[in-house]
Amino acid sequence: EVKLVESGGGLVQPGGSLRLSCATSGFTFSDFYMEWVRQPPGKRLEWIAASRNKANDYTTEYSASVKGRFIVSRDTSQSILYLQMNALRAEDTAIYYCARDYYGSSYWYFDVWGAGTTVTVSS
C-alpha cells in the first residue's frame, strides 16, 4: 500500500521556522517527483514546491510565494520528504500536503496524497 504521512505542523510566530516531514512507503521513493501543496483557509489548493526524482538529480522548484524562504529536500535512505519553512508569514497559514507526482498517458498528475498537517502563523 502506498502511503504518505505528513507531520511537523503547529503554531509558530511570524518570522519563525518549522520543518514539515512526509514519511513515504509502498513505492520506490527515488523514482518519483514529490510535491508540496497547501490550502489556506477558505482558499484553493496552491502548489508550492517540487523535488524531482533521482533521474533528474533531485532538483527542486518553488512557487514565487515561497521561493527563498522554503527549502524542499529528501532523505532517500528513509524515504522522507522535508519542507523547511523559514521567515514564516501569516499568509503561510494553511494545511500542507505532500503528494506523489505520477506520469501517465502523456500527462502528469498527483496520484497519492497525505492527510495533511496544519500550520498556523500567528502572534
Swiss-Prot record:
Entry keyword annotation includes Ubl conjugation: no
GO molecular function: antigen binding
Keywords linked to the UniProt accession: Adaptive immunity, Hybridoma, Immunity, Immunoglobulin
Domain of life: Eukaryota
SMART domains named in the record: IG, IGv
Ig-like domain residues: 1-114
PROSITE patterns xref list: IG_LIKE
Biological processes, Gene Ontology terms: immunoglobulin mediated immune response
Record carries keyword Oxidoreductase: no
CDD domains associated with the record: IgV_H (cd04981)
One Gene Ontology CC term in the entry: immunoglobulin complex
More details: All those sequence appears to be identical.
PANTHER family assigned to the protein according to its UniProt record, in alphabetical order: IMMUNOGLOBULIN HEAVY CHAIN
The protein's name: Ig heavy chain V regions TEPC 15/S107/HPCM1/HPCM2/HPCM3
